[in-house]
Amino acid sequence: LYSDLIIANPETGESYRSGEAAKKVLVDFWGLSDEVGSGKMYETMDDAIESITGYNLALAQEKFDEAYDIAVAQGLMKEGDKVQIKIGLPNSTTNFYTKGYEFLVNCYTEAVVGTKLEGKLEFTMDDTLGNGFGNALRANQVDMLFGVGWNGSALDPYNLMEAYTSEDYRYNRCWDTSSEMLTVELNGVEYTASVWDWNEAIMGEEITVKAADGTTSTFRAGTSDDNQEERYLVLCALEGAVLETYEMIPMIDNSTAALKSMQVEFYTEEYIYGVGRHGDFKYLTYDYSDAEWTDFVASQGGQLNYN
């Protein structure tokens, strides 16, 4: 749910994703927990996470068939019915959305080949949503969105979680976070409260939690409370709960790339949030004067190999 660019501790620059509890969320979600450890498939959680691609066509096709059988058995569709999927776009004037739409349609169409859904998927688009994409999804006017969503709060993942758990912000109207219960282990004790109550707790509100033995106590872990480690653990548990709803499905990713010249050195080769790697021109240093650079290029036969 959260990328490496979400910072859990602005004072230290530590990203949310770098913490062990956040790593475990991913390992658990992708079903790799039993495969991590000495002598197992993955030595560390980092190794396991590195292996995650989210792509397993054979398993996906099994699930397509299972979903089809369930839908027919429950009377949600009849054999031979078409499944209509409307993808919402803010507009159709940019390549990102038009090409993205084509990409998703092709991927799903090809993925169901050989399954009971082959030839039964029909895609349409609504490219008139503009900034109203969230309301359109909540009102079931569209079935899928991509390339849109919440931004901001990169330095406050605790506040950002409200976008996925609150009635005012979340896209999924079917998930009642005030009644969905979530158990979080804190200091060796398992405590249970609703998803929404846990969210309130990390925002500084006092809530009542129930321990495994049935006893109740109060809990709060806001910005000013002296239990930031527990606050982080609750946030991780909330991320896991959101992922388990399977409403946020990783479908696409985008990135940018730049070629670093042999003529310069960056201030650091490590990414720094808000700065990047080179931190603007004032942090660049040059390895050659213009004359030295000309000589260097000539010494390489006039062509530099950046492979």
Where are these regions (language model features)?
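Bilobed periplasmic-binding protein-like "clamshell/Venus-flytrap" ligand-binding domains
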Residues: 1, 63-92, 202, 206-261
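Short, solvent-exposed loop/beta-turn-alpha elements that line the ligand-binding surface or hinge
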Residues: 7-58, 73-82, 136, 162-218, ...
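Generic hydrophobic alpha-helical scaffold/packing signal
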Residues: 61, 105, 134, 138, ...
